């Protein structure tokens, strides 16, 4: 490998005009396999993030023109890019979460299509795997895993008794892990 001191700096405080953030906030640039876009997530101790998007090629070249996606006030807690689609997990006016979709090339949260409406369960996180999009759902304290299908309908994936689920971004599959619990 190369010397890390020669790596380009893609984001830091004061590097890009218009993208200011507090000392407590940290930038994270996320890329998704097969997407031509990169997502910049600014986060702190809140579950919500402030997000921007830019073409991946421009980002890697160090000349990204970041387009705003959402602010902290929009209460977006998770996001993935699937091809040309940007999926956002939104809690604003939906405390149990809802999943919306907008264009990655020209995101408009206000006009995003609702993919999964708020329901009786809590949408905790989303992840993209090779075979689709997965939702981690909390149902009365029990974790559930659902693979998103056409028109927002999903297929529940049975987890072994005592299993929780982890949703690593970009994995080939969503992997369950067994929690340490006492069984009666």
Q: Where is each model-derived feature located?
A:
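Peripheral, non-catalytic segments that deliver or gate enzyme domains
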Residues: 1-184
């Amino acid at each position: 490998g190369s010397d890390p001191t020669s790596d380009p700096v893609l984001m830091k405080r004061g590097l890009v005009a218009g993208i200011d953030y507090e000392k407590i906030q940290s930038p994270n640039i996320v890329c998704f396999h097969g997407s031509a876009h990169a997502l910049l997530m600014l986060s702190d101790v809140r579950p919500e993030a402030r997000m921007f998007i830019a073409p991946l090629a421009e980002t890697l070249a160090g000349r990204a023109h970041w387009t705003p996606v959402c602010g902290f006030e929009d209460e977006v807690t998770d996001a993935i890019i699937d091809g040309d689609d940007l999926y956002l997990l939104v809690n604003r006016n939906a405390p149990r979460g809802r999943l919306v979709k907008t264009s990655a090339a020209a995101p408009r949260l206000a006009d995003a299509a609702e993919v999964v409406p708020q329901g009786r369960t809590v949408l905790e996180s989303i992840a993209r795997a090779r075979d689709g999009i997965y939702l981690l759902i909390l149902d009365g304290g029990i974790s559930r895993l659902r693979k998103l299908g056409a028109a927002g309908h999903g297929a529940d994936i049975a987890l072994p008794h005592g299993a929780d689920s982890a949703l690593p971004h970009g994995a080939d599959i969503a992997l369950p892990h067994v929690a340490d619990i006492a069984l009666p």
